[in-house]
A protein has these predicted regions:
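AAA+/P-loop NTPase substrate/partner-engagement loops
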Residues: 259-292, 299-304
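Walker A/P-loop nucleotide-binding motif
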Residues: 234-253
Length: 439
């Protein structure tokens, strides 16, 4: 194995925490005969333990060795893979180097660990080649990655030669992408050791859809139309969803990533204390073959906060043009995002309804940079009852509408008033009581 791994060209720079190189070194020591049996066995178990951990995180099953090799291929962000991500497999000399590496990976897929197992009297490699994972709930592992990697692993197992192997891998790159941006829907920003911001995958995103959001049909339609245009490569606007709390603004944004992930949409969640990192984040993603929504939840600024100036410059106003593959979507309970004070109005005059205050104009200019503003208002009492009844049906609660409405009325009087969130909390309560009564 060590000889095979040492001959990789395109895939030579494997991730630092890869298992392939340590296993190759173990095989080299075994082949050379200069090893301590107990130490070598312990090292093998250490790598197998890591493989089992990876299998648990991603929900891998059956042949964990093949799954891991497939996972390694889709995780390596080398120039060849990133080019395939954008345009698919193109003619060029690099293809010959890639096929050379894929021939090696084919041999790794078929690698025979039996001699090693016999000599050390172990059977761990046999076990991981036919692994039966414990059934887990989807929220306990990244099902999105699991399904895609295992499908690729199965396809690569059936590849007759390096050309078929090449076709399978490059198709995956073009269809889904490569690395963490290709495999994950959503990200948050963390500060790396070097001080530069790092995109960290959010592995378990909420599986909400627009069908789960009752009402607000006009608002959802406007949001979908703008996002459809963006994903399709047509002109689209930055979006601000504003209005009363608990009305579904954040849920609408979350539903977008579930609807359009397969079409190349990715989402990056950012908080206002991270706005100064936006330029560096954009530099990391602007040349990738995805559409990015930079998402800001519950956005608002107090009088003393100046982070909004970073945001203004990024959205529109800086020297560098915002890339076509990036939009900013925000939610807020405030229409104008920034808290206004009477001091802001001291020098206000009004001509035909236009404020002349420089302070106010500076603050209001931020919201004007969102070309699409959508209002989510508090539902009426009738709409609230409709939301309650629809949610009850979706959850399988067989209760009369009159009873639901009467109880929902009592609930909202003590739980923050009428809203979609209040309705969902009420249904959660009813479902919990129903489940408890069955015990």
């Amino acid at each position: 194995m060590h000889k095979l791994v040492s001959q990789l060209v395109v895939y030579r720079n494997l991730p630092a925490d890869n298992l392939l190189e340590p296993l190759a070194a173990i095989c080299a020591r075994f082949a050379g005969g200069s090893y301590n049996r107990e130490e070598l066995t312990a090292e093998i178990y250490e790598q197998v333990h890591k493989l089992l951990d990876i299998g648990t995180v991603y929900g891998f099953d059956k042949n964990l060795w093949h799954n891991y090799l497939a996972f390694l291929l889709v995780s390596c962000e080398n120039p060849f893979a990133i080019t395939c991500e954008k345009v698919g497999a193109c003619d060029g000399s690099v293809n010959q180097f890639a096929k050379h590496d894929f021939k090696i990976f084919q041999q790794l897929f078929a690698y025979d660990f039996s001699e090693l197992e016999r000599a050390l009297e172990i059977n761990c490699f046999s076990l991981i080649s036919n692994y039966q994972a414990v059934v887990k709930q989807e929220r306990r592992y990244n099902k999105n990655i699991s399904d895609k990697v295992q499908a690729l692993s199965t396809a690569l197992e059936g590849a007759a030669d390096a050309d078929e192997f090449f076709a399978c891998v490059t198709k995956f790159y073009h269809d889904y992408g490569v690395g963490k941006l290709g495999l994950n829907k959503a990200f948050r920003i963390a500060q790396a050791q070097q001080g530069e911001p790092e995109l960290v995958p959010i592995s378990n995103t909420e599986q909400i859809t627009f069908d789960d959001l009752i009402g607000y049909e006009d608002q959802k339609q406007r949001l979908l139309e703008n996002t459809e245009a963006f994903v399709a490569g047509r002109p689209a606007n930055n979006v601000l969803l504003f209005g009363d709390s608990g009305t579904g603004k954040s849920s609408s944004i979350k539903a977008l990533i579930n609807k359009y992930y397969d079409q190349g949409l990715r989402m990056i969640e950012i908080y206002k204390h991270q706005f100064r990192d936006l330029s560096q984040v954009i530099a990391q993603i602007k040349n990738r073959n995805y559409r990015f929504i930079i998402y800001m939840d519950d956005l608002s600024f107090e009088e003393f906060e100046i982070e909004y100036k970073y945001l203004k410059a990024i959205i529109e106003g800086g020297l560098e043009v915002r890339p076509d593959n990036i939009l900013i979507y925000a939610t807020s309970n405030r229409r104008h995002l920034i808290n206004e004070t009477w001091k802001d109005r001291n020098d206000v005059t009004q001509e035909d309804g236009i404020y002349k205050s420089d302070t106010m104009q500076e603050k209001l200019s931020l919201v004007n940079r969102f070309g699409c503003t959508i209002y989510y208002g508090q539902p009426t009492q009738k709409e609230y009852y409709k939301i309650v009844c629809e949610l009850a049906k979706k959850q399988g609660l067989e209760l009369a509408d009159d009873f639901l409405c009467a109880e929902a009325r009592k609930w909202e009087l003590h739980h923050g008033g009428i809203s979609g969130r209040t309705a969902q909390q009420f249904i959660n309560y009813l479902q919990g009581v129903a489940d408890f009564s069955k015990k």
